[in-house]
C-alpha cells in the first residue's frame, strides 16, 4: 500500500479524484483514509484551492466550477436538461401572482414554458426574457433598466437594484452558477451576485433551478446562504446525501 504521508503529489491526486466523484471532501475522513494528520489534509486542500480545483469550506472542501460562459454560449449547453427543469419551474407559478425571473438560459426556457393563459405580473432584468414574455397577452411585463451586462445578458447595476427595491415578489426565480449546503448559492460575477441579493430580499419565496453538476460546487462570490432559499429544482440524479443536507435547511427539493 502506498505511504501517502511520504508522497504529497499522489495524495493530492487522490483527493482530487475523490472531489470529482463526490463533489466534496471532509478533512477528518481524508486523514483517516490516507493515514495523515488533518493539518496535512488542510495543507493539501490549500494547495488544490490555489490551483482552482476546489474551494475550502468549514471542515473540508467542495469542488470548484470553471468560470461561467457568456449567456449566448450557455444557451446551447444541456438544452434538454434545462428544458425539463424550466417546465417544472413554470408549473410552480400561480395565476395572479407577481414574480421575478432572473437572467440565465434555464430561466429563459422557463419564460417560454409559462402558460399564456395565466394572468401574471412578471419582472425581469433580461431584455431577451422580456421579449419572450411580451408574446403572452395576459402578462404585465416590467423590465428593469440600466446598462446591459454582456456576460449575464441582464441589467444588474445600481439602477436595477434601486428599482427592484420598490417591488415585492410572490416568487423569485434566481439563477446560480453553483450551490452547496455549506456555502449556499454562489456566482462568478460580483455585480450580478449583488443584484441577486437585492432581489432575494424582496421575494416571499425564492426558487433556484440548477443542473446536477452545479451541486455541490462553489463559485467565487456568495449570493445567499442556503437557509434563504425555499425551493431547488434539479435533475433527479442529485445525490441523496445533498438533497438531505439541503432539506435540513428547510429547502424543498423538486426533481425532474
Would you name each region that the model predicts?
Residues 121-122, 171:
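A residue-level structural signature of the nucleotidyltransferase/glycosyltransferase Rossmann-like core
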Residues 2-103, 111-119, 134-139:
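HTH-adjacent hinge/linker in prokaryotic transcriptional regulators
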Residues 107:
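Conserved SAM/SAH-binding loop
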Amino acid at each position: 500500500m502506498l505511504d501517502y504521508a511520504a508522497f504529497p503529489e499522489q495524495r493530492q491526486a487522490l483527493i482530487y479524484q475523490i472531489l470529482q466523484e463526490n463533489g466534496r471532501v471532509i478533512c477528518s475522513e481524508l486523514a483517516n483514509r490516507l493515514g495523515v494528520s488533518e493539518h496535512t489534509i488542510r495543507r493539501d486542500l490549500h494547495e488544490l484551492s490555489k490551483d482552482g480545483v476546489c474551494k475550502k469550506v468549514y471542515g473540508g472542501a467542495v469542488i470548484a466550477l470553471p468560470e461561467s460562459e457568456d449567456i449566448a454560449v450557455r444557451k446551447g449547453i444541456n438544452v434538454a436538461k434545462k428544458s425539463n427543469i424550466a417546465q417544472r419551474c413554470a408549473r410552480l407559478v400561480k395565476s395572479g401572482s407577481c414574480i421575478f425571473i432572473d437572467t440565465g438560459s434555464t430561466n429563459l426556457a422557463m419564460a417560454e414554458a409559462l402558460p399564456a393563459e395565466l394572468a401574471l405580473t412578471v419582472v425581469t432584468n433580461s431584455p431577451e426574457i422580456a421579449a419572450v414574455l411580451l408574446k403572452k397577452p395576459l402578462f404585465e411585463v416590467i423590465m428593469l433598466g440600466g446598462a446591459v451586462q454582456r456576460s449575464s445578458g441582464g441589467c444588474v447595476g445600481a439602477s436595477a437594484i434601486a428599482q427592484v427595491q420598490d417591488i415585492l415578489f410572490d416568487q423569485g426565480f434566481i439563477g446560480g452558477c453553483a450551490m452547496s449546503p455549506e456555502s449556499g448559492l454562489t456566482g462568478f460575477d460580483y455585480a450580478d451576485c449583488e443584484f441577486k441579493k437585492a432581489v432575494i430580499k424582496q421575494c416571499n419565496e425564492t426558487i433556484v433551478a440548477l443542473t446536477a453538476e452545479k451541486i455541490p460546487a462553489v463559485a467565487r462570490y456568495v449570493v445567499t446562504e442556503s437557509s434563504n432559499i425555499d425551493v431547488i429544482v434539479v435533475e433527479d440524479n442529485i445525490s441523496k446525501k445533498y438533497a438531505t443536507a439541503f432539506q435540513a435547511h428547510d429547502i424543498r427539493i423538486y426533481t425532474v
